[in-house]
């Protein structure tokens, strides 16, 4: 069985990502990595805090946070730099 799962946070409601994270931990996954870019960064942070404080209090820790920048092709083929984040959650 896998010990790590990655969840890409995007345009869906925050509760969808919270439920996916909690289900992963309940399935025996020990580490979940939330990845987000641009406007979805705040949704990833909210997801991590909700899982840690409301859904699995005392069972999950925020182990690491990485701030990154990705280069993506924008409109007209121009290259843009977009902020990104990776939040690592682990069972305590």
From Swiss-Prot:
Domain of life: Archaea
Signal peptide (residue range): none
Keyword Cell membrane listed: no
Predominant cellular place of this UniProt entry's protein: cytoplasm
Gene3D superfamilies to which the protein is assigned, alphabetical: Alba-like domain (3.30.110.20)
DNA-binding in keyword set: yes
Location within or outside the cell: Cytoplasm; Chromosome
GO MF, one example: RNA binding
Positions of modified residues (N6-acetyllysine): 11
Function text: Binds double-stranded DNA tightly but without sequence specificity. Involved in DNA compaction.
HAMAP family per record: AlbA (MF_01122)
Protein name: DNA/RNA-binding protein Alba
Species the sequence originates in: Pyrobaculum calidifontis (strain DSM 21063 / JCM 11548 / VA1)
């Amino acid at each position: 069985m896998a010990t790590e799962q990655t969840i890409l946070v995007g345009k869906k409601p925050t509760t969808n990502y919270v439920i996916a994270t909690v289900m992963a931990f309940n399935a025996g996954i020990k580490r979940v990595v939330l990845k987000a870019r641009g406007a979805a960064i705040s949704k990833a942070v909210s997801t991590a805090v909700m899982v840690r404080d409301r859904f699995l209090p005392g069972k999950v820790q925020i182990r690491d946070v990485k701030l990154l920048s990705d280069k993506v092709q924008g409109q007209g083929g121009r290259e843009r730099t977009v902020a990104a984040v990776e939040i690592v959650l682990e069972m305590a």
